């Protein structure tokens, strides 16, 4: 319970600080990273809770919208999945799994978002726009390659935190 509370509070606080400094520009997904860390350290229920609560709580202060549902549920599911990766110790493997998890999260939330706002567009069109939007602006944005950069930085943060916490816990034992 303590790990879940601390990581949820950290995710919300750092997301709010990131928004205060950089605005809505996404360059690291802090709630998703903390959900993965929670799942890895404390199990599937903790990962799910941190993923769900961190997006809902931070969006209550930043602005709730239909995206809150997508973000919270996708982050919760990724965090829960990380509860089953506790045996993974290799840093490169942790980074790779973090990157793939962040990519899956981004694709799922982009498809859900564009499905909602593109009306009667075909599923193939929605998928094309969602994937393209990870690399080039498609809906009025101005950032290029924001998806891969966000995924890489989120994966780096997650893998470093997991390894460091494991190291500290190992030294304390």
Over which residues does each language-model region extend?
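Membrane-helix interface segments
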Residues: 1, 44-49, 88-94
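Alpha-helical transmembrane segments of multi-pass membrane proteins, especially transporters
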Residues: 3, 7, 31-32, 36, ...
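Short amphipathic alpha-helical segments, especially helix-boundary/capping motifs
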Residues: 6-14, 30, 54-58, 121-122, ...
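Transmembrane alpha-helical segments of multi-pass membrane transport proteins and ion-pumping complexes
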Residues: 11-16, 40, 44, 48-51, ...
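Interfacial aromatic-anchored transmembrane helix boundaries in multi-pass membrane proteins
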Residues: 13-30, 52-86, 113
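Membrane-embedded alpha-helical hairpins and interfacial helices in multi-pass inner-membrane proteins
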Residues: 21-25, 64-69, 84, 88-173
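Short amphipathic alpha-helical patches
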Residues: 32-40, 80, 84, 123
């Amino acid at each position: 319970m303590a790990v879940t509370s601390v990581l949820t509070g950290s995710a919300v606080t750092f997301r709010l600080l990131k928004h205060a400094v950089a605005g809505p520009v996404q360059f690291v997904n802090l709630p998703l990273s903390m959900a993965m860390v929670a799942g890895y350290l404390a199990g599937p229920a903790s990962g799910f809770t941190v993923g769900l609560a961190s997006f809902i709580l931070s969006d209550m202060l930043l602005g709730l919208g239909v995206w809150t549902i997508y973000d919270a549920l996708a982050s919760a599911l990724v965090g829960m999945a990380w509860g089953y990766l506790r045996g993974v110790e290799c840093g490169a493997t942790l980074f790779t799994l973090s990157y793939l998890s962040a990519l899956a999260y981004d694709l799922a939330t982009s498809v859900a978002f564009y499905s909602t706002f593109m009306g009667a567009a075909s599923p193939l069109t929605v998928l094309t726009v969602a994937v393209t939007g990870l690399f080039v602006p498609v809906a009025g944005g101005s950032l290029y390659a924001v998806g891969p950069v966000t995924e890489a930085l989120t994966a780096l943060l997650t893998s470093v935190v997991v390894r460091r916490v494991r190291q500290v816990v190992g030294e304390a034992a």
